[in-house]
Each structure stands twice: as structure tokens, then as C-alpha cells.
């Protein structure tokens, strides 16, 4: 299972050793992401199975065929300051004073418009319709997670006055209990599970209303694994994907997903 991991150094050495011990064994591999995009685009289906793929269903095909629900995908302007700084640098580097003045006026107008745009509290209030639902919140690291949790009263109070916050990360001895409590919590509170490098793959939680992406990533694998936590086969309700950091902008997987759906 998850045979793409055989491309990693330690996993790969162990896989080769195991195959040498069992040369006559019949080998079956399962994965949702056979291509290791951040490892020179290595296709582990080619390396391990010589391209013998018995069955292949893309995420787009699964959505079109109704196996997985079509999510409600929401993006935000949460990180617009970084974009404005990048655009300001480009304007400053223009050589023509006239062109620079015109572009500066457009940029200033954009800055004023963004400053008046809804904050995350308004975004969450509007889009989180299941006020007592369960949401997985993906964070980059412990410091980042602590910062995001500190904003819970500010960001989620208009969704639900009562919020249950759970934390899950590998170095925390209380993770197993927190994860179990999150899964069994049937209260009327809004349930938020903040996690770091967990629940990306191999673990699926039933009854998830959506995911909130606070972790920037350029990996299509991590991106699909994270949004996949909101997609459960057979569900009829549209799960919510709140892409706060706009991961979709830097990933070719979005255009790829559109292509998969059109082809299906």
C-alpha cells in the first residue's frame, strides 16, 4: 500500500531487499499518487511494475462518475500583502516614468480594494454552513499551528460561540487521545482538528464537513491528500474546502484536475 513511498531512500532500500528475498512473490501495489513530483517526477508504477497498471482512476473521474462528491472550493485573499509587495517591486523596476505612474495608480487602487475586503472571520461565517461540523485544519509546523489556534476566537466566533479545538502532531504524546476524541465528538460545538504532517495519507475520518488549508505547499501529492480528507465515497453533501493560502494558484494539479474531469 502507498507504493510511491518506495521511491524514498530508506523505504526503497527495504523494498529492494524484500523483493530479493521473495523473487517469486506476486506483487500488488496501491497508491493514489504514483508520481513523486518533488523527486524528479519519478513514476513508481514504471519503476516497480514496469508500467503494468491494472486499474487507474483519477480524482477528476471519481468526481464526474459520482463516486466522490463535488466539493465547494473557496479561496481567499488572506495573503494578499505578499502579492502586493511582489507587484510593487515590479512597478518600481519599470523604466518609463509614465508607465510606472499608471501602474502605480492601478496598484494603489487594488491595495485599497483588498484592504476593504472581508476578513477571515467573515469568510468563515459565510462559508461554514455546518456550524457544528468537523473540520481538519492543516498547518505548516508547531509555531504556525499555535499562531492559527490563537486566532480561533477571532475567526470562528461568528460561526459558533462554542469551538472545540483538537491538536494532532507526531511529537505530542496526547495526539492519539485528541484524535480519538475528535472522531467521537458529537456535540453541538464547532470541531476543529489542527494537525501537522498527519492525516495526509493512509487515514480517513468519516463525518468530516470540510478541510481548511493553512499550509502552503507546491507538492501536488500533499495538496491532493489534504483535500482528499474532505472527500468520502458515497457522500451526497458537498464538502467544504477552504484554501486560505491559495495553494491552487501554484499547482499544475488544478489544470490537471480540470482536464481529468473533461476527459471523464
Spans of features found by a protein language model:
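Conserved helicase ATPase core of P-loop NTP-dependent helicases/translocases
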Residues: 136, 146-147, 152, 159-200
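A short beta-strand-to-loop transition that corresponds to the Sensor-1 phosphate-sensing loop
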Residues: 2, 30-34, 141-142, 196-198, ...
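Interdomain helical connector at the RecA1-RecA2 junction of SF1/SF2 helicase-like NTPases
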Residues: 39-133, 149, 153
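Short glycine-/polar-rich loops that comprise or flank the Walker A/P-loop
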Residues: 22-26, 50-52, 68-72, 161-164, ...
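Conserved Walker B
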Residues: 2-4, 199, 215-217, 230
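Conserved segment of the helicase C-terminal RecA-like domain
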Residues: 229-257
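SF2 helicase catalytic motif II
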Residues: 1-36
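SF2 helicase motor core recognition
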Residues: 66, 192-211, 227-232
Amino acid at each position: 500500500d502507498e507504493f510511491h513511498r518506495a521511491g524514498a531512500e530508506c523505504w526503497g532500500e527495504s523494498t529492494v531487499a524484500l523483493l530479493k528475498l521473495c523473487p517469486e512473490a506476486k506483487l500488488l501495489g496501491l497508491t493514489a499518487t504514483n508520481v513523486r513530483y518533488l523527486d524528479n517526477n519519478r513514476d513508481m508504477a514504471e519503476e516497480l511494475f514496469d508500467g503494468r497498471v491494472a486499474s487507474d482512476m483519477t480524482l477528476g473521474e471519481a468526481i464526474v462518475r459520482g463516486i466522490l462528491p463535488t466539493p465547494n472550493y473557496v479561496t481567499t485573499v488572506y495573503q494578499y500583502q505578499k502579492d502586493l509587495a511582489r507587484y510593487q517591486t515590479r512597478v518600481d523596476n519599470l523604466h518609463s516614468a509614465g508607465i510606472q505612474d499608471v501602474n502605480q495608480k492601478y496598484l494603489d487602487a487594488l491595495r485599497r480594494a483588498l484592504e476593504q475586503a472581508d476578513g477571515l472571520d467573515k469568510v468563515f461565517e459565510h462559508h461554514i454552513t455546518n456550524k457544528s461540523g468537523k473540520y481538519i485544519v492543516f498547518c505548516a509546523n508547531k509555531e504556525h499551528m499555535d499562531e492559527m489556534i490563537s486566532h480561533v476566537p477571532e475567526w470562528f466566533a461568528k460561526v459558533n460561540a462554542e469551538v472545540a479545538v483538537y491538536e494532532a502532531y507526531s511529537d505530542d504524546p496526547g495526539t492519539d487521545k485528541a484524535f480519538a476524541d475528535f472522531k467521537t465528538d458529537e456535540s453541538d460545538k464547532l470541531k476543529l482538528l489542527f494537525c501537522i504532517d498527519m492525516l495526509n495519507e493512509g487515514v480517513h475520518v468519516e463525518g468530516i464537513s470540510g478541510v481548511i488549508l493553512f499550509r502552503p505547499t507546491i507538492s501536488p501529492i500533499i495538496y491532493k491528500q489534504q483535500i482528499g480528507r474532505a472527500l468520502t465515497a458515497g457522500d451526497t453533501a458537498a464538502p467544504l474546502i477552504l484554501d486560505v493560502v491559495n495553494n491552487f494558484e501554484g499547482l499544475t494539479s488544478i489544470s490537471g484536475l480540470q482536464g481529468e474531469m473533461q476527459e471523464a
